[in-house]
From Swiss-Prot:
One Pfam family recorded for the sequence: Cons_hypoth698
TM region(s), chain numbering: 16-33, 38-60, 73-95, 99-116, 128-150, 160-182, 189-211, 221-240, 247-269, 284-306
Protein name as catalogued: UPF0324 membrane protein BT_4609
Stretches assigned to coiled coil: none
GO cellular component: plasma membrane
Length: 330
């Protein structure tokens, strides 16, 4: 029988949960009010994820069923909305240059990630694969798209996303400094940043800090790599199908493709509409990160340990050095 003190604690935790979620949502949508946009700048996916993690580790899981169900569907809707931020023609055009290296780097990252995660550190399959996918393609967006196809648990998503976001934050500060130390041209740095930094947002930030040409090169190359979400999602559904289990067709990826096509050919005359839908999708993705973080438990975190972070760091270092070698010697 639950004591009155326990009931009071659970009620308080649920109140705190609602307060955090309401605050995040409130500040997120201040972005649409002229003059108040700056107030929403701090609400980013990493911040939302870590707020969810802090809540879960200090207060426990207030609404586990709500978190699980909401994060599942909101994540898929958000991925579809992200398609309205991509131009298919631009991505394909930028992909013609260096296509061979793009293919090699994506496939190579997945294979190296598998070896480090599964063979060396014995990390669970889903977490290791999500970290490798995020490193190979476009960070959190790739994990958001691949996770539902993989039927990954919220705890596995949290660990993978947390690893990627930590490395993203580090890259945003150290990459420009390393680029200047190595006297890299803006084109070289843009190429390196697009391949070695996970999330598009951090790629854009690092490119902008280095120079205008670096920003342009980094953005176009990263856009091309983001298209790999599509074949990766379908390949994942086939590769990880259990014996006797039907193939899980990632239908939301079809809608992602349709959104991208619509944005390229139907909304090219009204780019504001595509940008608005994409903006809402990014905000719902940020809220989803809170749900995913709030689903983690201290027991899960203890069982996982630091191995996923070590996999992410080692994989990141290997890809960064390999890309540098390609830029300088090929």
């Amino acid at each position: 029988m639950i004591s009155s003190a326990t009931k009071t604690l659970q009620t308080n935790n649920k109140t705190i949960y609602v307060a955090i979620l309401s605050t995040l949502t409130f500040f997120l949508f201040l972005d649409y009010i002229p003059g108040l946009q700056a107030w929403s700048a701090w609400v980013t996916p990493p911040v939302a994820l870590f707020l969810g993690l802090i809540f879960a580790l200090t207060c426990g899981q207030a609404h586990p069923k709500f978190n699980k169900k909401t994060s599942k569907y909101l994540l898929q809707y958000s991925v579809v909305g992200l398609g309205f931020g991509m131009n298919l023609q631009s991505a394909l055009a930028s992909g013609k240059e260096g296509m061979e290296f793009t293919v090699i780097s994506v496939v190579g990252t997945l294979l190296i990630g598998w070896f480090i995660g599964r063979k060396i550190f014995k990390i669970d399959r889903n977490t290791s694969y999500l970290i490798s996918s995020g490193t190979a393609i476009c960070g959190g967006s790739a994990i958001a798209a691949i996770g539902p196809v993989l039927r990954a648990k919220d705890s596995e998503m949290s660990v993978a996303l947390g690893t990627i976001f930590i490395l993203n934050a580090i890259a945003l500060f150290i990459f420009p400094a390393i680029g200047h130390a190595l006297d890299m041209t803006e084109h070289q740095f843009g190429t390196w940043a697009a391949i070695a930094i996970h999330d598009t947002s951090s790629v854009v930030g690092a490119g902008a800090a280095y120079g205008e040409e670096a920003l342009k090169v980094a953005t176009t190359i990263k856009l091309t790599r983001a298209l790999w979400i599509i074949p990766m999602a379908f390949a994942t559904s086939f590769i990880f199908k259990s014996k006797g289990q039907k193939i899980s067709i990632p239908w939301f990826i079809f809608f992602f493709i349709l959104a991208m096509i619509a944005n390229t050919y139907l909304l090219n005359g009204v780019p504001q509409l595509g940008a608005a839908i994409n903006g809402i999708a990014r905000k719902t993705l940020t809220i989803t990160m809170f749900f995913i973080g709030a689903s983690l438990s201290l027991d899960v975190l203890r069982s996982v340990g630091v191995k996923p972070l070590i996999q992410g760091v080692l994989l990141w270092v290997v890809i960064s050095l390999s890309t540098l070698a390609y830029i300088y010697f090929v």
